[in-house]
């Protein structure tokens, strides 16, 4: 099933493969596998798929706050997300920014965040995505 890895805009066409990773228990924020499916995320997407896709290309920021690991909520930054695809979902890369400055808030680790699912690592996908 493998084809050359490319970046694709998140869309319904690729959603089943993305959801398959969640069902498999892959935490797509930390890119670790867990013992159980990530049912909260699956349910959120199922409840409002339009909202899910809107958040992947959020040029203005705002919208619902982002819940941090410590339970606090922070402002959603403008961001663009691309999925890594080689015939199936293999990861994602996200670009974040604040308007009118190069600075990011202290809770944001950088302008670029990316990850590759565990079974697709060591193929150069992250390097190619960058």
Task: Kindly label every feature range from the protein language model.
Residues 1-111, 118:
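GNAT-family acyltransferases
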